[in-house]
Swiss-Prot record:
Glycosylated residues in this chain: 77, 367, 485
Signal sequence, renumbered to the chain: 1-21
Tree of life domain: Eukaryota
Cofactor(s) needed: Zn(2+)
Top enzyme category: hydrolase
Gene that this sequence comes from: PGLYRP2
Protein name: N-acetylmuramoyl-L-alanine amidase
GO molecular function, one term: peptidoglycan immune receptor activity
Occurrences of domain N-acetylmuramoyl-L-alanine amidase (ranges): 406-532
Cell location: Secreted; Membrane
Deamidated asparagine PTM sites in chain numbering: 274, 322
Disulfide bridges in this chain: 419-425
Site feature: Important for catalytic activity: 447
UniProt xrefs under Gene3D superfamilies: Peptidoglycan recognition protein-like
């Protein structure tokens, strides 16, 4: 039943021309559409007619060729679903999120999820369908053009490729992975580089070792194909594709328009990567779940809610940790390479692939995988200011002189309870900003970043504005606070890992923080108990902690800032 319902929704998404929806662009609306399909469409009818909707999609681009070849489709008149099983409002929604696209600084086909993240619907649904089909595999080189859904091939051991998705302890990709070896695919693939000297000269040559032997349908239709094609375009134009560009909704309660923060962003936006990774995670889960599987509406409600099967670690908040546990960089690189090889063999051949050698494809795959694993999977998810409803900066912010040499750790003290969901964390951010602006008279919230216990970092003054977090040292380092009072207790392991590992390492990689940066607790520079005894004792064991910095003389510190502020309705937080 679940697979048939998904075929119908995929067909609706791909077949319908973009229109205007009356429903807000929320993940809850997509879940509502799935629930309505599950209720109204007979299980015996769904799979056959839904694939007709997919086949009638007007877009014949390379992504649809992958969908058709790896997921399967039948030629059937799409009007057999008349009358449409969806209400006019939900049909309007499917038209609104028909296909993912980026045009003139706007992003289409995306919705706002309950965790505050923006998610592209198309790669999410493609991943769900691939998982329902059992993660089909196609062997390379192609002996025939028979689609894998016709041969019935599946992975004999999916768990060996994708371990338990709920393992959230690993911050990065596993280094160990099975070696993939086979005969050189170049011997079985037509020479696609003849007559293309310009392309041949424009790309660095890479020795093609261990060429790909198979393509995983789940990775191909979600991540691998899009990563490969986007970085292929970048390599041919001598430019580096932007990865993970964020954006802002026109409103959070009933979002309708999503504007990217970089109008020149590539298709690999944050929303697309979120949707693709969610598709991989949930597709893998479905491929390993025996019948009867949960309904898709129920599964998505759990995943974008409290957690699948009541596991709080298995939810969208922790998609990067869970996604990183599913594969290794070497396997993903092979899948990107293999998917590009597959696209070379499908008709009509993608024009940019027509003149590419296997060595060049291998280089594109390596570059794409490195950027994805280091700049996306290996970095924390940061909600931009617009996502938590920040008020404008009062005055004119002063710019930092980057890179900086210090990272100052704080706790907010008030709010004292850790925030574990987007609604509470966003409310805490707005409350702290109001106090800092209205009571303290500062231009903005004082911290550079605030870390919640919901799996997200919240942008305060960010990487470029001087903060108001560590008196006398604001221009020398970033101030990072963890929501909560850590006098006697410690933050969650996920929050600690963010401050200790992922946030600073990504800042170093981006040239924002010096590689030899020093990490200090607030109390080392100002007479205060911040960041709390329990947290500070732990900081002293961290690699970049520096114990030799002396606190500022008492005469240069205000009386009020020498003590922790007492609890109050408005969060006092650190007073520098």
């Amino acid at each position: 039943m679940a697979q048939g319902v998904l075929w119908i929704l995929l067909g609706l998404l791909l077949w319908s021309d973009p229109g205007t929806a009356s429903l807000p662009l929320l993940m809850d609306s997509v879940i509502q559409a799935l629930a309505e399909l599950e209720q109204k469409v007979p299980a015996a009818k769904t799979r056959h007619t839904a694939s007709a909707w997919l086949m009638s999609a007007p877009n014949s681009g390379p992504h649809n060729r992958l969908y058709h070849f790896l997921l399967g489709a039948w030629s059937l008149n799409a009007t057999e679903l008349d009358p449409c099983p969806l209400s006019p409002e939900l049909l309007g929604l499917t038209k609104e999120v028909a296909r993912h696209d980026v045009r003139e600084g706007k992003e289409y086909g995306v919705v706002l999820a309950p965790d505050g993240s923006t998610v592209a619907v198309e790669p999410l649904l493609a991943g769900l369908e691939a998982g329902l089909q059992g993660r089909r595999v196609i062997n390379l080189p192609l002996d025939s053009m028979a689609a894998p859904w016709e041969t019935g091939d599946t992975f004999p051991d999916v768990v060996a490729i994708a371990p338990d998705v709920r393992a959230t302890s690993s911050p990065g990709l596993r280094d160990g992975s099975p070696d993939v070896t086979t005969a050189d695919i170049g011997a079985n693939t037509p020479d696609a580089t003849k007559g293309c000297p310009d392309v041949q000269a424009s790309l660095p040559d890479a020795k093609a070792k261990s060429p790909p032997t198979m393509v995983d349908s789940l990775l191909a239709v979600t991540l691998a194909g899009n990563l490969g094609l986007t970085f292929l375009r970048g390599s041919q134009t001598q430019s580096h594709p932007d990865l993970g560009t964020e954006g802002c909704w026109d409103q959070l309660s009933a979002p309708r328009t999503f504007t990217l923060l970089d109008p020149k962003a590539s298709l690999l936006t944050m929303a697309f990567l979120n949707g693709a990774l969610d598709g991989v995670i949930l597709g893998d889960y479905l491929s390993r779940t025996p019948e009867p599987r949960p309904s898709l509406s129920h599964l998505l409600s759990q995943y974008y809610g409290a957690g699948v099967a009541r596991d709080p670690g298995f939810r969208s908040n922790f998609r990067r940790q869970n996604g990183a546990a599913l594969t290794s960089a070497s396997i993903l690189a092979q899948q990107v390479w293999g998917t590009l090889v597959l696209l070379q063999r499908l008709e009509p051949v993608h024009l940019q692939l027509q003149c590419m050698s296997q060595e060049q494809l291998a280089q594109v795959a390596a570059n794409a995988t490195k950027e994805f694993t280091e700049a996306f999977l290996g970095c924390p998810a940061i909600h931009p200011r617009c996502r938590w409803g920040a008020a404008p900066y009062r005055g004119r912010p002063k710019l930092l002189q980057l890179p900086l040499g210090f990272l100052y750790v704080h706790h907010t003290y008030v709010p004292a309870p850790p925030c574990t969901d987007f609604t509470r964390c966003a409310a805490n951010m707005r409350s702290m900003q109001r106090y800092h602006q209205d009571t303290q008279g500062w231009g903005d919230i004082g911290y550079s970043f605030v870390v919640g216990s919901d799996g997200y970092v919240y942008e305060g003054r960010g990487w470029h504005w001087v903060g108001a977090h560590t008196l006398g040292h604001n221009s020398r380092g970033f101030g990072v606070a963890i929501v909560g009072n850590y006098t006697a207790a410690l933050p969650t392991e996920a929050a600690l890992r963010t401050v200790r590992d992922t946030l600073p390492s990504c800042a170093v990689r981006a040239g924002l923080l010096r590689p030899d940066y020093a990490l200090l607790g607030h109390r080392q520079l100002v007479r205060t108990d911040c960041p709390g005894d329990a947290l500070f004792d732990l900081l002293r064991t961290w690699p970049h902690f520096t114990a030799t910095v002396k606190p500022r003389p008492a005469r240069s510190v205000s009386k009020r800032s020498r003590r922790e502020p007492p609890p109050r309705t408005l969060p006092a937080t650190d007073l520098q």
